[in-house]
Amino acid sequence: MPDIKITPLGAGQDVGRSCLLLSMGGKNIMLDCGMHMGYNDERRFPDFSYIVPEGPITSHIDCVIISHFHLDHCGALPYMSEIVGYTGPIYMTHPTKAIAPILLEDMRKVAVERKGESNFFTTQMIKDCMKKVIPVTLHQSMMVDTDLEIKAYYAGHVLGAAMFWIKVGSQSVVYTGDYNMTPDRHLGAAWIDKCRPDLLISESTYATTIRDSKRCRERDFLKKVHECVAKGGKVLIPVFALGRAQELCILLETYWERMNLKYPIYFALGLTEKANTYYKMFITWTNQKIRKTFVHRNMFDFKHIKPFDKAYIDNPGAMVVFATPGMLHAGLSLQIFKKWAPNENNMVIMPGYCVQGTVGNKILGGAKKVEFENRQVVEVKMAVEYMSFSAHADAKGIMQLIQNCEPKNVMLVHGEAGKMKFLRSKIKDEFNLETYMPANGETCVISTPVKIPVDASVSLLKAEARSYNAQPPDPKRRRLIHGVLVMKDNRIMLQNLTDALKEIGINRHVMRFTSKVKMDDSGPVIRTSERLKTLLEEKLAGWTVTMQENGSIAIESVEVKVEEDEKDPKQKNILISWTNQDEDIGAYILNVLQNMC
């Protein structure tokens, strides 16, 4: 049986640094190439030495697929292509290709220009890397080479996020990246057809979570923000540039308008303009409501939300600030946090998942003091709230996706080991599917049955259609088509018997077996035949006994014929013949006639 092999170089029983090596049918595909936001050393990048100990990896990888623009899925891409060395094709959607280089450049500035880190990619490397990108369109099959085919499906999550169906020969895998099975205020729900892959590789960030109702969550969020600013406090909402930021901005904008509130709301400078540009450019990726109203009213032209200037950090009075990045691991959001954390009137609301090692993860874990690299210690007196507006599938959504695409095996990545184990047992109970959860560096081998795709002849399909119309089958059971497999000129065709024999130039021959029984009867042959037919009908109740034009009697393929005995006119010869398929019937009828005679 052919094998599918998967080795996580990142996101194996872990969140962050998503990077999987998929091998099947002699092809090696890299799925995502992210960086870990919780590390500032070599651990931030996937360990590419698993592919080749040193040197370029081009000859070992057939293609790279990037699911979306979040840095934990694409942050190591320039490092991999320009420093490690990869010149092959990189596939991603059009929005991902447009947005990823901006986020990569922002990250590079923070790491190199502010923190002074070395062994990092340059601006030119980002540009050179993006030249290797081949953009893909949703639901469009793309041939990487003669054997490797990929297709992108809508994943929700963020603008341009896609799940990928990957096929080599008869084997297929679906890689979800990050996805959301619930529509929100600006994006639709993830969707995939019933593709029945050999393996579904699914994220499992919220493997044990069933989210409360969206309306309750939004009401709680608005209540906490309003209460904090009403008493003069400041609210920090760390977000990533595109995605939850737009979702929460729309929510607050609508609430401020309805309640006629005047407290200032700020968004990190430049990001609102960028968001507007990309949502206009890729409007087809948003949900139906935004697509319908965009011409008349741009949902992202905010009346109450203004660009933020760093000088506002020390301004007195209440305010709400959206700042990047979303995990408080660097940038403006971390600067604001350091200033506002010691004040108990202030609040930070974490709307998404924070990986281990980030400041966001530490304060969500209850840390009252946070120590930084320069030995600066910040006391955390401000209120810390976690409200999941994360655009990841919860446990219910993951189960729904499994039901939708009907995989033969499931693999969980991008999650915590304990939560994965719980979900694995749920999948086993509900779907009886083998579920894998390899750790980083661990190769998982999945055997798949041999499947050979064949063409079917038109005449065979027409015959099956007639049979289907005559007696529709049970829709829950797969319909089998029977025919003759003809292999000719590197083509395999399933045909009916007549066409198959004609195709390969063979005349059909039928072998018949004949036995003779003597019977005392001096009357005419036709009368003997009629009397014999009546006797056989009595003896063979349930069988169809017919008289042929040539005077012979037919029972299935068995033929009974009466002839004169040339030597004795008072006797008749009864000849019984049958094909090898009906040997049992022929032997039974022969026995009946022998007893009669």
Swiss-Prot record:
Alphabetical GO biological process terms: RNA polymerase II transcription initiation surveillance; snRNA 3'-end processing; snRNA processing
SUPFAM superfamilies linked: Metallo-hydrolase/oxidoreductase
Enzyme class: hydrolase
Mutation effect (residue 414 to Y): Unable to rescue lethality in Ints11-knocked-out flies
Tissue specificity as recorded in UniProt: Expressed in neurons and glia of the larval and adult brain.
Quaternary structure, from the entry: Belongs to the multiprotein complex Integrator, at least composed of IntS1, IntS2, IntS3, IntS4, omd/IntS5, IntS6, defl/IntS7, IntS8, IntS9, IntS10, IntS11, IntS12, asun/IntS13, IntS14 and IntS15. The core complex associates with protein phosphatase 2A subunits mts/PP2A and Pp2A-29B, to form the Integrator-PP2A (INTAC) complex. IntS11 is part of the RNA endonuclease subcomplex, composed of IntS4, IntS9, IntS11 and inositol hexakisphosphate (InsP6).
Similarity comment text for this entry: Belongs to the metallo-beta-lactamase superfamily. RNA-metabolizing metallo-beta-lactamase-like family. INTS11 subfamily.
Name of the featured protein: Integrator complex subunit 11
Source organism: Drosophila melanogaster (Fruit fly)
